[in-house]
């Protein structure tokens, strides 16, 4: 199973205790996996469709507990290449469908006409628990989260822009920074920062998923730090080797053209050590001098030797 599926299975096992939270979570599920059918004779039906059996059981229980009815259920296998199972929860009775939609503030009657509310009615977000329940339902119905080993990305898909904006506003009320974009015929509310995704998982109650993601984040950060250290050390080693080769080349040129006695005693001493010990660092070379010289002092002398070699080459060209 994917990280996203595991997260949904964990969330579907959380059952809200307060009626306000049950209503809020059901409202979000209707917005994301529900469809309302309106017929010419004034009849209305409500259908939920999901490929997650845990989510289907949650919808069934919420309707049963809130409205005291047993909704119809159906399992359907996909055709052609997609053989996955779909679970349908069906409320065919107009009166009950209207009661459910009215309770979650999606359906209103104005002057004898039915009016659909596409945004999130603030009346169902009565407290912090209800807000969290709504976000949990929105994730169960239309949410997904990428495998944190590959990328940090969490999104909620909705069919309506007004709902998408309200959902983003609800998420951001928890000091987060979600954004809304259009994707084909849908709207996507998304977050891309690891810390913010962790916060959302905490808000909706996915604590096991949160711990797994945090463990992966820590591992990735440690791995990146190790890689940075290795790359830095490799770069420094390469730089040191190149400098050593350049210094030895300069010393050999002086030796072959005018001899090392051409150099002042302090430079000659360093030159001989560098040729005899090409792998030593500047610090180690300095410790072998009499008296010992610091790293910067050795570096200064070797630069002087390179300058002398350069001048000798220029004279030869002239």
UniProtKB/Swiss-Prot annotation:
Its taxonomic placement starts with:
Bacteria, Bacillati, Bacillota, Clostridia, Thermoanaerobacterales
Query: What protein does this entry describe?
Result: Probable cell division protein WhiA
Q: Does the keyword Cell division apply?
A: yes
Assigned keywords, A-Z: Cell cycle, Cell division, DNA-binding
Describe its function.
Answer: Involved in cell division and chromosome segregation.
Its family remark reads:
Belongs to the WhiA family.
Where does this protein come from, organism-wise?
A: Thermoanaerobacter sp. (strain X514)
* DNA-binding region(s) in UniProt: 281-314
> Molecular function (GO) terms listed?
DNA binding
Instruction: List, alphabetically, the Pfam families matched.
Output: HTH_WhiA (PF02650), LAGLIDADG_WhiA (PF14527), WhiA_N (PF10298)
